[in-house]
């Protein structure tokens, strides 16, 4: 199945000059969503990890589903003010501003091996912040998995020392 045909391009969103890759048509289609999750799980089937860590919002959809299918725990990473317990955070740059990601301070135990999952790998900024959070808690990032990669933004240059798996590449 060509999953790329389920990704909708939205020009000039969230600001002029950016083409947003909308995954909601893929999520809406039962067969495409199942195929995407199955294939993403296959991409990491040879990796040994304990937890899936994923950021809100679309990362939750993919990460939690993959964690369930793979029999792993799931750790949500959220924007400020959304987690009820004590958190640690990292700031990072987006194409259109600065953002913070928070994780519960006890979400990853020292030595736990982590798979990071998100919907789109663009500049690599979010992924870098997620890696820093996992390391701050004593975890080890063994791989990162993304539904979509925007290769023209060259995110792998920033993440060159990490194992990166992507399903759809632009």
Swiss-Prot record:
It catalyses: AMP + diphosphate = 5-phospho-alpha-D-ribose 1-diphosphate + adenine. PROSITE patterns: PUR_PYR_PR_TRANSFER (PS00103). One of its GO terms (biological process) is AMP salvage. HAMAP family: Aden_phosphoribosyltr. This is Adenine phosphoribosyltransferase. The keyword Transferase applies. Homodimer. It is an enzyme of class 2 (transferase). The gene is apt. It is found in: Cytoplasm. Gene3D superfamilies: 3.40.50.2020. Belongs to the purine/pyrimidine phosphoribosyltransferase family. GO terms for molecular function: adenine binding; adenine phosphoribosyltransferase activity; AMP binding. Its EC number is 2.4.2.7. Pathway: Purine metabolism; AMP biosynthesis via salvage pathway; AMP from adenine: step 1/1. Keywords: Cytoplasm, Glycosyltransferase, Purine salvage, Transferase. Catalyzes a salvage reaction resulting in the formation of AMP, that is energically less costly than de novo synthesis. It holds the Pfam family Pribosyltran. GO terms for cellular component: cytoplasm. It comes from the Bacteria. SUPFAM superfamilies: PRTase-like. InterPro entries: Ade_phspho_trans, PRibTrfase_dom, PRTase-like, UPRTase/APRTase. Its main location: cytoplasm.
